[in-house]
């Protein structure tokens, strides 16, 4: 299995995760009437985003456009500084991508969270409140879906 075949598999996997997240919000939530499903959708969106960022970093490193580091946070910083714009992510999109990563981290670290009115409320260790709404998660899905499409068009078209 070559590099581009593996890339295609990761793009497809990312797309499936986004579809799962969207299905959770649009289909499962109205039936189950449980806003905690938004947190599950956020996890799917974060996994999809992380897969795409990893793929972009590997591809850009292979093309010798960037340098990779052993530190994951440094590599994510490289993505935002040198790669995101190349893949069609403007300042607002990059802000949303960072928010996905931030909220996902807060969700994982949170000792206390609850759902109310189709929103998930997360309390962090510093007693700050973070809210994820249905509308917000759909916005996240849209941004990551756009990144997925741009990766598909950029990385996989370069093969031909």
Where do the PLM segments sit?
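Charged alpha-helical initiation segments
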Residues: 1-38
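Hydrophobic packing residues in well-ordered alpha-helices of helical domains and bundles
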Residues: 7, 14, 38-41, 97, ...
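Short acidic DE-rich linear segments
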Residues: 155-160
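N-terminal interaction modules that seed assembly of large macromolecular complexes
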Residues: 23, 29-63
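Amphipathic, well-ordered alpha-helical segments in soluble domains
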Residues: 13-24, 44, 51, 143, ...
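Long, charged low-complexity segments
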Residues: 62-149
